[in-house]
């Protein structure tokens, strides 16, 4: 796997490196009201429902223009009634963004804040739901890319269902690779985006929700553009988007779906991403780097590494040296220790990940960093996290 246009690999959790044929699909223009484009929209919706496991026809897929955060806000504003109360499970930037969004929407919420990188567990969710009968909805992030943690969504869903509440999931950086089957995970709705694990390009996201929840959402949204019910209703009646759709992004997504199926769907994609992660972690450990999370919680999407303790290490320099070798990495988002992140998704495989490790080694040599071991405090922090989880 090598970008044919010479651009660097994007080792980020989306936008990511896409296949050449996915880029090529954007070379044609499409009429947004034309029958051919309406057929593409219908194929997009049915394909995503198939990936979600909706064999009973209880759910529907509503694509929406904009970034993933637009879709998260649309889901929250359309599916949570104004007099409802949400429990937000937060362990990173995207859980906190949900809390901020609910504040803008005027929706009451309680927050279970697990810090930067601890997972919410079923037992504590059950206790909070028992203690607060006001709570009607639970909102969870599937993969929190701030740290790379894969939250236990099955456990969260079981706890929520046991207590008779409704679950909304931000599966932005997980759906398509990490299993999210609505036959096994009881949820009211979830959202994801074109430019994540399906490996499309930015431009739209989608809400997959129970049809009953969509019907109940009529007239509830705070926004015309982000009204999931109205988008759903118009698409079902006309096959069209209400406002100008991202035609080129949709065309690219159709090609990305074809490649997704050729790879074996969710199972095949997860296998490649998980292998990417394992090859990366093993190689980085040989250089002295240590991952933040233990294997139990480490997602196949992005891995957080502690920054080396060596006094000559500077992330800004490291970043530029990696970029010169053809790799764009991510800065860290932890509050306790210095870190950086490397993504494992997109058009990359184990051979690319070995080249990433080699580029890291070259960068360390250039910087005069003999060993990438983290400070003792970071390892102690990891030990504490492992015990707490």
UniProtKB/Swiss-Prot annotation:
It holds the Pfam family Aminotran_5. Keywords: Aminotransferase, Pyridoxal phosphate, Pyruvate, Transferase. The keyword Transferase applies. HAMAP family: PhnW_aminotrans_5 (MF_01376). Homodimer. Involved in phosphonate degradation. This is 2-aminoethylphosphonate--pyruvate transaminase 1. It comes from Paraburkholderia xenovorans (strain LB400). The gene is phnW1.
